[in-house]
Amino acid sequence: MAKLHDKYQETVVAELAKKFGYTSVMQVPRIEKITLNMGVGEAVADKKVMEHALRDMTAIAGQKPVVTVARKSVAGFKIREGYPIGCKVTLRGERMWEFLERLVDIAIPRIRDFRGLSAKAFDGRGNYAMGVREQIIFPEIDYDKIDKIRGMDIVITTSAKTDEEGRALLDAFNFPFKK
């Protein structure tokens, strides 16, 4: 079991219940899922690009990504409906906790010129979205084997009702927010 999951069950639940005055442990916010999304627009011109993106995403997430396709044809972007334009992974359960641990302890500290995560990236319902500019911050990615530096979106979906609750939950996991 991941250390963060143990920490959540042993200390975070009690802290948040006390802070927000919850009467039941089921009211305490929890992380429901983490979604990783990588947009690969260049895949329209070169099919190999998508294979590299899928390989990187598989290494980072520990599970096979789903290829996302264009819903509409857009002449300006030179894409047709059904063209592969990205990939995504939804992590839940044990894999989610292990990824969160790697993200907080290893990947985020490796971001170049890092000054803290923006606290404004909450969506109003306690979910947090962040962007990563380089996939090489993850230790699973071998720098010599990548074809191109690619970024990705990471969305942490929580059961929190407000941004304040969501922030308190992520603060309890030592998320490095800007002060």
Curated annotation (Swiss-Prot):
GO terms for cellular component: ribonucleoprotein complex; ribosome. Keywords: Ribonucleoprotein, Ribosomal protein, RNA-binding, rRNA-binding, tRNA-binding. It holds the Pfam family Ribosomal_L5. One of its GO terms (molecular function) is rRNA binding. One of its GO terms (biological process) is translation. Belongs to the universal ribosomal protein uL5 family. Part of the 50S ribosomal subunit; part of the 5S rRNA/L5/L18/L25 subcomplex. Contacts the 5S rRNA and the P site tRNA. Forms a bridge to the 30S subunit in the 70S ribosome. This is one of the proteins that bind and probably mediate the attachment of the 5S RNA into the large ribosomal subunit, where it forms part of the central protuberance. In the 70S ribosome it contacts protein S13 of the 30S subunit (bridge B1b), connecting the 2 subunits; this bridge is implicated in subunit movement. Contacts the P site tRNA; the 5S rRNA and some of its associated proteins might help stabilize positioning of ribosome-bound tRNAs. This is Large ribosomal subunit protein uL5.
